């Protein structure tokens, strides 16, 4: 994204080019570091505050005994040209082109993802497939209206049989709540552009060129994992005098009712205070509201507390066998195991695995912070993951030679029945602060991808430099346009949530 010469810094919180009052960016994930990068390109100083000891957020890469793994696999795929340019600018030849293969594992069989009609037909068998087709016809003839829940949305497009076969178990494993409690807009965002009828039509009409919106047949991936991207950005920011401070937890955000004036980190004797011109925040909205000083109105505080999150942990297993399976990752729909998804990081990049003939698997478990799974000892989680990968037939227990566990709180904002009304209350209040800019997945409480988070950061910087974009309205559901000049096409027609 290029900044035109006629853009000027916003005066809302003072001159953003004043190094005495830099822009403060909360969070060093893709959104926060992208914001710092774009400000640097515009000649504006910033300080990034990250409470963890490493950068990258959910897009970090962890190194264990030389083996690298993601906190969930991160494909680098976008139709936003500015995001694509940034990836290539930072990574250069280390940004690899990879073929995508991901499948569903269900009752001992593999199914293509997204679903393909013939694959489903032969995988389920004639009887089950016939029932699925009749169920879909019935759903089309008598759709569930109004379409409120994720269950409504999926049944209307696939019928109840396929919903219960492929969607219900996995979705409830991921979110920890019933599909009837998940809003339909989550399904619209994550499963868009596909239905059983469209799959059948594609097969019968031989429309081989048609691409389902959620499907990409290839993607980019950094040689050493997504953390390589964000470590590189951090280094370049620091070299230009724009520090990224880790272990810097925000404890207080002071305001005067319409401007943020100061951000404090790490309370007590080590407290440090930053006077600010602008604040860009990717921290969870619940935490942002709780840090405001003076406190937000009780109605806003209560709304923030009602926002829910799903937490996540990865068990990385080192296996002394190669070529365990061809997929980048596998979705585990089988209800007999707790694991939700399994990554094979050597299939993302061979440089993630330092020893020839070995593999590094990432078993992903979805949980709530402090529940039984989250609270298990690491040794028990390693034993659980080893048993489950063996039961699934993906790796023999005897071949597992090591492993580690990484926990990630607040990985996914939950789209439950009340989140939209609570988010409206929070947004209306935050709109009072002219120099506060929420961005990213948790900053906006939107279940979006890495490129979408980066795009919201780019728009926030444009706003600081004098443009006007409604970041809350950025629509991660639609087809992205190639140029940032067409950013207006990426926002919902209804800008309010």
Report each predicted region and the residues it spans.
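Mid-domain catalytic core of redox enzymes
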Residues: 42, 248-395, 406, 420, ...
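Glycine-rich FAD pyrophosphate-binding loop
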Residues: 40-63
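Active-site/ligand-binding neighborhood in enzyme catalytic cores
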Residues: 120, 125, 130-253, 275
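N-terminal Rossmann-like FAD-binding beta1-loop-alpha1 element of flavoenzymes
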Residues: 21-48
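C-terminal lid/capping helical subdomain adjacent to the catalytic/cofactor pocket in oxidative enzymes
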Residues: 3, 13, 409, 416-497
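Feature captures the FAD/FMN-dependent oxidoreductase FAD-binding
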Residues: 82-99, 103-113, 157-164, 236-246, ...
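Conserved mid-domain beta->alpha element of the FAD-binding
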Residues: 144, 277, 281-288, 374-381, ...
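Dinucleotide-binding Rossmann-like beta1-alpha1 core, especially the glycine-rich loop
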Residues: 65-142
């Amino acid at each position: 994204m290029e900044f035109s010469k006629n853009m000027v810094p916003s005066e809302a919180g003072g001159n953003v080019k004043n190094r005495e009052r830099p822009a403060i960016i909360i969070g060093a994930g893709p959104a926060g570091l992208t914001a710092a990068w774009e400000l640097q390109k515009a000649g504006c100083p910033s300080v990034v505050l990250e409470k963890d000891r490493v950068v990258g957020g959910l897009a970090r890469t962890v190194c264990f005994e030389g083996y690298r793994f993601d906190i969930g696999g991160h494909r680098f795929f976008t139709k936003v040209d500015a995001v694509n340019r940034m990836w290539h600018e930072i990574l250069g030849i280390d940004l690899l082109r990879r073929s995508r293969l991901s499948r569903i594992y269900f009752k001992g069989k593999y199914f293509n993802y997204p679903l393909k009609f013939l694959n489903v037909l032969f995988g389920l068998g004639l009887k089950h497939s016939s029932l699925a087709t009749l169920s879909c016809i019935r759903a089309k003839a008598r759709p569930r209206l109004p379409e409120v829940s994720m269950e409504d949305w999926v049944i209307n497009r696939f019928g109840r049989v396929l919903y219960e076969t492929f969607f219900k178990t996995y979705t409830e494993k991921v979110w920890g709540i019933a599909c009837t409690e998940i809003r339909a807009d989550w399904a619209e965002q994550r499963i868009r552009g596909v239905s059983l009828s469209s799959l059948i039509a594609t097969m019968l009409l031989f429309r081989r060129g048609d691409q389902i919106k959620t499907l990409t047949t290839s993607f980019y991936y950094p040689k050493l994992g997504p953390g390589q991207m964000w470590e590189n950005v951090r280094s370049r920011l620091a070299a230009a005098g724009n520090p990224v401070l880790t272990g810097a937890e925000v404890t207080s955000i002071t305001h005067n009712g319409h401007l943020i004036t100061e951000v404090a980190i790490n309370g007590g004797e080590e407290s440090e205070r930053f006077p600010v011109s602008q604040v860009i925040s990717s921290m969870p909205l619940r935490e942002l509201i709780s840090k405001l000083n003076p406190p937000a109105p009780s109605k806003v505080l209560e709304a923030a507390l009602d926002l829910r999150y799903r937490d996540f942990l990865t068990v990385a297993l080192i296996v002394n066998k190669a070529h365990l399976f061809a997929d980048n990752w596998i979705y585990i729909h089988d209800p007999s195991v707790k694991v939700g998804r399994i990554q094979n990081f050597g299939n993302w990049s061979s440089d993630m695995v330092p020893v020839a003939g070995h593999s590094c698997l990432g078993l992903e478990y979805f949980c709530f912070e402090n529940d039984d799974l989250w609270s298990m000892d690491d040794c028990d989680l390693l034993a659980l993951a080893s048993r489950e990968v063996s039961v699934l037939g993906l790796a023999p227990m005897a071949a597992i030679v090591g492993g580690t566990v990484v926990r990630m709180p607040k990985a996914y904002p939950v789209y439950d029945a009340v989140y939209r009304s609570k988010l409206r209350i929070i947004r209306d209040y935050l709109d009072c602060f002219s120099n506060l800019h929420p961005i990213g997945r948790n900053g906006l409480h939107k279940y979006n991808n890495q490129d979408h988070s980066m795009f919201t950061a780019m728009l926030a910087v444009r706003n600081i430099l004098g443009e006007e974009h409604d970041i809350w309205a950025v629509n991660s559901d639609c087809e992205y346009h190639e140029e940032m000049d067409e950013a207006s096409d990426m926002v919902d027609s209804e800008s309010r949530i």
